[in-house]
Amino acid sequence: MEFFNILQSACNDVNLDFNDKKYNQLISYKNLIQEWNKKINLTAIVEDDEIIKKHFIDCIKIFKSSPIGEAKSLIDIGTGAGFPGIPIKILKEDIEITLLDSLQKRINFLNTVIGELQLKNIQCLHGRAEDYAQEIQHRQKYDIAVSRAVANLAVLSEFCIPFVEKGGYFIAMKGPSVEEEITAATKSIEILGGKIEDIIKIDIEDTDLKHNLVIIKKVKETGKRYPRKPGIIKKNPLK
């Protein structure tokens, strides 16, 4: 009951309904992470309490950003072990989710989670964001792109903004010190058709984690040349 109460409290804070079904799905997800993490490297966070607080509650906090609540479609880029895409799907069943990752082993894990939890309207893509963002069925097709991946904001923006339709949002889940990244990325975000709309500070209760949600609105279409070819984005971020 302790974990149920912790998760319910976090959901209450962002006006989300929470029930036994959602709780059981999250616990099953936690168990699968712990089981698969013995075979492949999914996360360094493996204890029950830490997975609940540092992964699940961190993902719940993304609902502090108003665009998530109204979104019909979302792509999670560089999803890794499924964060934040799978918790978002569990907590908001009516949203269509696409999980994108470059490692086949992680895709195998994610498909197992989707099957075990009987999640609907959720798909996995194996490959690079740079490639999928040029495909007509994915380019500028999503209400929301989100990423919790470790990369600077200028790089993440070029990976993610091309997936977002005009009027949609890219939400970057960043660490505590984001001001310099934002300053360095402002021009690249503008080039890609985005505009920083909000920065939401996030505290994770009973942990030392302090995060920021950078909310970027897509105000114009992304030019056809973006994203650039694989390898170029990280070597030469837009400035």
Swiss-Prot record:
PANTHER family named in the record: S-ADENOSYL-L-METHIONINE-DEPENDENT METHYLTRANSFERASES SUPERFAMILY PROTEIN (PTHR31760:SF0)
GO molecular function, one term: rRNA (guanine-N7-)-methyltransferase activity
Enzyme Commission number, as recorded: 2.1.1.-
Species for this entry: Clostridium botulinum (strain Hall / ATCC 3502 / NCTC 13319 / Type A)
InterPro entries membership: rRNA_ssu_MeTfrase_G, SAM-dependent_MTases_sf
Protein name: Ribosomal RNA small subunit methyltransferase G
SUPFAM superfamilies (alphabetical): S-adenosyl-L-methionine-dependent methyltransferases (SSF53335)
Main localization category: cytoplasm
Broad class of enzyme this protein falls into: transferase
Keyword Transmembrane helix set for record: no
Keyword S-adenosyl-L-methionine recorded: yes
Function: Specifically methylates the N7 position of a guanine in 16S rRNA.
Cellular compartment(s): Cytoplasm
Record-stated family: Belongs to the methyltransferase superfamily. RNA methyltransferase RsmG family.
Keyword annotations of the record: Cytoplasm, Methyltransferase, rRNA processing, S-adenosyl-L-methionine, Transferase
GO cellular component, one term: cytosol
Residues the record lists as binding S-adenosyl-L-methionine: 78, 83, 129-130, 148
Tree of life domain: Bacteria
